[in-house]
Amino acid sequence: MSSAPTTPPSVDKVDGFSRKSVRKARQKRSQSSSQFRSQGKPIELTPLPLLKDVPSSEQPELFLKKLQQCCVIFDFMDTLSDLKMKEYKRSTLNELVDYITISRGCLTEQTYPEVVRMVSCNIFRTLPPSDSNEFDPEEDEPTLEASWPHLQLVYEFFIRFLESQEFQPSIAKKYIDQKFVLQLLELFDSEDPRERDYLKTVLHRIYGKFLGLRAFIRKQINNIFLRFVYETEHFNGVAELLEILGSIINGFALPLKAEHKQFLVKVLIPLHTVRSLSLFHAQLAYCIVQFLEKDPSLTEPVIRGLMKFWPKTCSQKEVMFLGELEEILDVIEPSQFVKIQEPLFKQIAKCVSSPHFQVAERALYYWNNEYIMSLIEENSNVILPIMFSSLYRISKEHWNPAIVALVYNVLKAFMEMNSTMFDELTATYKSDRQREKKKEKEREELWKKLEDLELKRGLRRDGIIPT
């Protein structure tokens, strides 16, 4: 009895080095609805009359029925299944959005649990796994949520619900609780930027309306960031969470609490270390500046933190750090500047000396900033000695003529600020260079003598008498 022919293994299983582009194309074909559910048979929803077509006395009950109908989830992975019912749910959601926006008296106490239930049924789900080795958020297209035609309207409805003049947090807090917020925060890892944008608005509204949830929300964002920095280095919604935090920090009362200062130093500063910094750096820098505008005394720990995590091998990140540093210097108090000027300008001197012209250029652009120039001028007796040797050397040796031109402008500015010290430093630099050249010449002569001596010994060993 012959056995049935075996199917050869697929390429996926045997080729561990299949081309990334092929794997990505295959991924795209199989993407991506986290709303996937196997349907045994077509879903049938009983059509209900439009809310505007029934008497106002019947609208509250019909509103609840429509909310319950919208709890039914469809399989958007199968583009041909339940087309009529998918369209019916979409039109019902649209109707609910309009109704909650226009109608008065629609938010009764009975509607709150049904609204939260409908929203929860639709948005809370396990997100599809994202292989961080495969997906590069800087280069690759994100995986879009297939069920977005429904999901978008659910988010739109929920935002209108939260923004309604009739919305009562005292009733809603029974249903929008810590568990709800925790599930909401998990959704920020969605690859779909459209969803993260809606989530940002939703969380912001919840933070504004539920005073009892504020500390919990901050703590959970803190936990997400710590896990991101020290464990996973993968979370899609960092930029959006930082954007929300920017508004939250702006509203902090003074004096700042110890927990807020700790969040800055222990969480926000270490966020600079991750590889994907470019995806959220603008929002991170904004948060840092907000803190410093609230409490200038935090300037020193922030600057020292940036110096500690300054990139050693990534020029792109160095340029970002320099940009952020300029934003900080734009709001720095002169009294705080004095405390950090030495370590700061030692780092700037290194950047100016960088062989990577974009790093050097970005550092030299500081001298185009009027406020920074005024700070430098007030403290030129400290800053000029730190910067001088690097600037003078670059003016003679740098490979890029554009950088040399910028350096000449900086040297000219320093000369106008403090001509006496400039002349002294120039004389000292030239004297030091002459001394170095003399030592170098002596070293070369010594090596030449040693080589000659070794050569003579070799000749004697070979029986040749040198003349």
Curated annotation (Swiss-Prot):
It comes from the Eukaryota. GO terms for cellular component: cytoplasm; cytosol; nucleus; protein phosphatase type 2A complex. Residues 30-40 have a biased composition (Low complexity). One of its GO terms (molecular function) is protein phosphatase regulator activity. Its main location: cytoplasm. Found in a complex with at least ARL2, PPP2CB; PPP2R1A, PPP2R2A, PPP2R5E and TBCD. PP2A consists of a common heterodimeric core enzyme, composed of a 36 kDa catalytic subunit (subunit C) and a 65 kDa constant regulatory subunit (PR65 or subunit A), that associates with a variety of regulatory subunits. Proteins that associate with the core dimer include three families of regulatory subunits B (the R2/B/PR55/B55, R3/B''/PR72/PR130/PR59 and R5/B'/B56 families), the 48 kDa variable regulatory subunit, viral proteins, and cell signaling molecules. Interacts with SGO1. This is Serine/threonine-protein phosphatase 2A 56 kDa regulatory subunit epsilon isoform. It comes from Homo sapiens (Human).
